[in-house]
Structures are given as structure tokens and as C-alpha cells.
């Protein structure tokens, strides 16, 4: 197991505080996959939770903007929504034509909702990091919420921006599969980096780091599966009753 030097690392400031100094931190966080990288990042004098919150808000805002354009492109191209419950589409009214007004309304609505996406991103990101750090503490971790928040933001934000751009290209049917595979690969890489960040910030072993990250992921996944299964069963029962009473 890698041995960490507990002496606080205080690298000299890059001389470019604020937005000008963000990009080097992001590049280091995603291009040097090693737990020591996140020790150095979080011990930097410029590392603080306020900066992390700003990063996440901007990423959520940009993601909302790109999603608005992606939805508009799909609407303009006549790409229909794929329903997760088989057979449900026949009971949902489908638009047979799209006019310019509908496209404009979709775009404006999406753009206006982008700031809300940024706020929600901050809330859920902060909650997720808090849960991971709480579990890490139970495993004997010595890190803090602020440090893990900063490290995770430095990892997640650049990939969120990249994924947002890919979402626009995924609206094109030919490129949809390619962007989907690429997004999946990036998601796995982000998960690995987050485990390294938890390990570096909390100064413990790989088992504790993996457990701290994966336990919440598994719990959320199982919860979503249960919710989806419940909705599918309820929807199926409702559709059966509708068919029975239909003339």
C-alpha cells in the first residue's frame, strides 16, 4: 500500500487565481491518475469548497444549456422519445409534425431552466460527497468534506462539460451509438479517479476507498431499480384496466 507523507503539502500558487487557474487543476486531476495527485491538489492554498461549488454550478449550467440544444435538435429532426416501458407509447399522444414555434419554445424553456440545473447539480453533488466522506470516516478515513469536495469537483466538472458536448452529437442518430460508448467509458474512468481521490484525501487503503464510493452507488442503483419496477407494475396494471374497459 502506498505510504503517504502526513506533512501538509503547500505547493506554490500558480500565480493565476480564479478562473485562469482552474484549467491546470482540472488537467492535473484527470491526467495524473494517482492518489498522490489529489493529496497535492487538496493541500493547495487555493483549494476550498467555495471554488468547488462554483465549478459544479457552472458545469450544471453548461450541461443544461447543451441539453436544451440537444432536445431542440432531436425535436427538429423528428426523433421520437423511447419509452422505458414497452407498449406505453401507444397510449401517449405523439406529435406528427413540428413547427418553428414548438422548436423555439423548447429551446427557450431549456435555456431558462439551465440555472436551475446548476443549482440542483450543486445540491446533489454536495450531498453525494457528504455521504461518501461520512462512509470514509466510518472506515477510519482522516480526510475532510471540503477536501474531498474539491478533489471530486476537479474530477467531475471537466467530464461533465465533455459529456454535455457529447449529448449534442448524440442527437444525431449516426453518432448516437459512438457517443454513448464514449460516455460510458468516461464514466468508468471518472469512477476510478474518484476512488483514487477518496484514498488520497483519507489516507487509507484501496478496500476502504472502493467501499466508500461504491456503497452509495449500489444503494442508489438498487433504489432506482425498485422505483422503476414499482412504476412499471403500476403502469402495467393501469393499462390493463384501461384495455378491459375500452370498447
Predicted regions and their residues:
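Short helix-capping/hinge motifs at transmembrane helix termini and TM-loop junctions
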Residues: 74, 78-79, 140-141, 166-174, ...
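Membrane-interface interhelical loops and short interface/amphipathic helices
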Residues: 76-103, 241-247
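Juxtamembrane boundary at the C-terminal end of a transmembrane helix
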Residues: 223-247
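Hydrophobic transmembrane alpha-helix segments characteristic of membrane transport
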Residues: 32-37, 75, 129-139
Amino acid at each position: 500500500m502506498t505510504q503517504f507523507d502526513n506533512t501538509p503539502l503547500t505547493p506554490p500558487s500558480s500565480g493565476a487565481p480564479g478562473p485562469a487557474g482552474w484549467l491546470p487543476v482540472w488537467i492535473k486531476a484527470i491526467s495524473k491518475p494517482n492518489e498522490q495527485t489529489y493529496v497535492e491538489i487538496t493541500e493547495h492554498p487555493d483549494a476550498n469548497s467555495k471554488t468547488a461549488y462554483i465549478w459544479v454550478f457552472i458545469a450544471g449550467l453548461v450541461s443544461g444549456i447543451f441539453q436544451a440544444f440537444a432536445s431542440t435538435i432531436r425535436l427538429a429532426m423528428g426523433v421520437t422519445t423511447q419509452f422505458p416501458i414497452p407498449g406505453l407509447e401507444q397510449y401517449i399522444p405523439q406529435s406528427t409534425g413540428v413547427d418553428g414555434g414548438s422548436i423555439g419554445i423548447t429551446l427557450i424553456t431549456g435555456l431558462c431552466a439551465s440555472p436551475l440545473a446548476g443549482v440542483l447539480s450543486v445540491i446533489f453533488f454536495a450531498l453525494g460527497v457528504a455521504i461518501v466522506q461520512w462512509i470514509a470516516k466510518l472506515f477510519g478515513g482522516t480526510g475532510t468534506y471540503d477536501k474531498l469536495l474539491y478533489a471530486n469537483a476537479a474530477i467531475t466538472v471537466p467530464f461533465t462539460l465533455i459529456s454535455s458536448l457529447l449529448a449534442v452529437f448524440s442527437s444525431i442518430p449516426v453518432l448516437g451509438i459512438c457517443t454513448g460508448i464514449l460516455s460510458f467509458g468516461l464514466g468508468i474512468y471518472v469512477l476510478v479517479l474518484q476512488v483514487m481521490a477518496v484514498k488520497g484525501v483519507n489516507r487509507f487503503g484501496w478496500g476502504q476507498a472502493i467501499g466508500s464510493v461504491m456503497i452509495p452507488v449500489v444503494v442508489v442503483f438498487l433504489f432506482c431499480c425498485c422505483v422503476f419496477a414499482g412504476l412499471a407494475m403500476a403502469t402495467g396494471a393501469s393499462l390493463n384496466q384501461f384495455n378491459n374497459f375500452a370498447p
